[in-house]
Amino acid sequence: MAVSARAGIVVTGTEVLTGRVQDRNGPWIADQLLELGVELAHITICGDRPADIEAQLRFMADQDLDLIITSGGLGPTADDMTVEVVARFCGRELILDAELEDTIANILKRLMARNPGFDPGNFDSVRAANQKQAMIPAGAQVINPVGTAPGLVVPGKPAVMVLPGPPRELQPMWHSAIQMPGAQEAIAGRTTYRQETIRMFGLPESGLAETLRSAETTIPDFGALEITTCLRRGEIEMVTRYEPGAADTYAQVARLLRDRHGDQIYSEDGSQVDDLVARLLADRRIATAESCTAGLLAARLTDRPGSSGYVMGGVVSYSNEAKAELLGVDPALIEMHGAVSEPVAQAMAAGALQRFGADTAVAITGIAGPGGGTEQKPVGTVCFCVLVGDGRNVTRTLRLPGNRSDIRERSTTVAMHLLRRALSE
């Protein structure tokens, strides 16, 4: 593939480095760069020490990158040192931008005016305390703040884009930031790519790997495709990036996948199973009955906007007594087959269907561990039932791998796919 403009991301913040706060900026910026056709070479995370930040910038510069993007360290406190470090790295003097200082002051004044105890007479001290945020490297291009922290682009080779740490500020600022002349000049060599996503469920990763090895030896110009695969909770996501001229090569690979794994492919347009289920549930009424997943399936179904139009309700029946009292499961059925069994899953689904006046119900009962397993029903044994009012009934028992959290999450994914298949028939 042709060499594109290359970028690196430096995420700053001791709270991110130590894991107290999850990095949401690096992956998000990476997606934006991918859409622009900019090759991401590195993402690094460092603490707030100036020497560590500068070391990351120099490492990035040594990789011959066109653009370095930093996030974090733009506040008014003593440990917010990113701008000062970037100025030193770029060999630029720090100067006070009077217009920017006024902009920040006006934002602060509006924010403080919401406080009934705000005394305008004390504002000068607040303005002085935040003056640091108006200090910028000479020649830097200013990106208007969303909060109080402005962003910056310092032109050069590499250009440096400086963005705030909070995602709620960084993300709205991105479009303006990447349109800055310094940023546009840095990524002028970007390549136009197409990107396609195929999602599969029920296919071992080794099965996909074998098919791709076959494609590599039988499809001309296979090397023109940049293919990445990711296995998540039993689903496989295959993302392919290519230049427009390789469209026919990708089409051949997609055909090969359909021929070999058509039953496992559930999306070729990037849609997730949650999106597909939401569409299939339009004009329906669904209820859930959950034991080991304790409401995770109901939470997932209601995560999509508009779900109130089709989700009637759910029952978490963790105990046998709750299964009997809330869902009408016959205690004798539990005594005969055990709480983790297909007959009980069917009875739970039927109870949810009746209790909520729904036309579709999903039930999950299982052993998430680490205790509770037996030789006959080891940890990871989960029973599912999808019941549709017209008589369709899909029941499965699976042994799911992983720890307690893995088993619970995988169970919700399996339930979503069983629901998708039942409603697609």
Curated annotation (Swiss-Prot):
PANTHER family: NICOTINAMIDE-NUCLEOTIDE AMIDOHYDROLASE PNCC, NMN AMIDOHYDROLASE-LIKE PROTEIN YFAY. Belongs to the CinA family. InterPro entries: CinA (IPR050101), CinA-like_C (IPR036653), CinA_C (IPR008136), Competence-induced_CinA (IPR008135), MoaB/Mog-like_dom_sf (IPR036425), MoaB/Mog_dom (IPR001453). SMART domains: MoCF_biosynth. It comes from the Bacteria. This is CinA-like protein. Pfam families: CinA, MoCF_biosynth. CDD domains: cinA.
